[in-house]
Regions:
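Active-site-adjacent helix/loop patches that line small-molecule binding or acyl-intermediate pockets
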Residues: 1-50, 63-93, 139-140
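A penicillin-recognizing enzyme superfamily signal
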Residues: 16, 78-188
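Polar/charged alpha-helical tracts
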Residues: 40, 44, 57-60, 109-112
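Surface-exposed patches in mature extracellular/periplasmic domains of secreted proteins
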Residues: 50-69, 99-103, 145-152
Length: 188
């Protein structure tokens, strides 16, 4: 992808753009997919609570259906750490969005199951290649990119870093073969 405006002045893959955390790559990809389709996928398939359209008291209209909110994270109301961890879980679950769960099951002192939290099995990605490619991109970020060093001995890791202007918000969303998680530092 290249329209001549990237900092490198050359074409590059989505994988390299993610590894180097180049926002222009995300924006160009979203432009091709369309903000509307991406918004629908995030809200309908991944359970994100985003703003379709809202008119403020001063008459200004806000919407998350645009490039800056979806490609760069400039969402009207933001997202929760739980939503991000849930979204990233699809990459380690063959494209299936299992919802977010705080626990898997609760047992009593004798091992009897009292409660079980069964995951949702709705499909997130309809194309398994998309899931595989995203997993590969995320693993490359921890192996060679902005999240280099976030590795565990003997465990495959992947993830994505994110920051806002002046580092007022800092994110890391990560995955291992069994778990996904997200960390946010902000409000400063």
């Amino acid at each position: 992808m290249n329209d001549g405006k990237y900092p490198t002045g050359r074409a590059m893959t989505v994988k390299e753009g993610m590894t180097r955390s180049l926002n222009t790559i995300s924006a160009q990809l979203l432009k091709q997919l369309t903000p509307q389709k991406s918004y629908e996928f995030m809200t309908q398939q991944l359970g994100f609570k985003l703003v379709d359209s809202r008119t403020n008291e001063d008459g200004t209209v806000q919407s998350d259906i645009d490039l800056a909110p979806l490609a760069l994270g400039a969402l009207t109301d933001g997202v929760t750490v739980r939503e991000m961890a849930g979204g990233f879980s699809t990459f380690i679950n063959d494209g299936v969005y299992g919802g977010t769960r705080t626990y898997t099951k609760v047992t009593d002192s004798e091992g009897n199951t009292i409660m079980e939290n069964t995951p949702n099995t709705d499909k997130g990605f309809t194309n398994v290649r998309t899931d595989y490619y995203m997993l590969d991109c995320l693993q490359n970020v921890t192996a060679h990119g902005t999240a280099y060093g976030i590795q565990l001995d003997g465990v495959e890791t992947g993830g994505k870093t994110g920051t806002t202007t002046s580092n007022t918000d800092i994110w890391f969303c990560g995955i291992t073969p069994k778990y996904s998680g997200a960390v946010w530092v902000g409000y400063e």
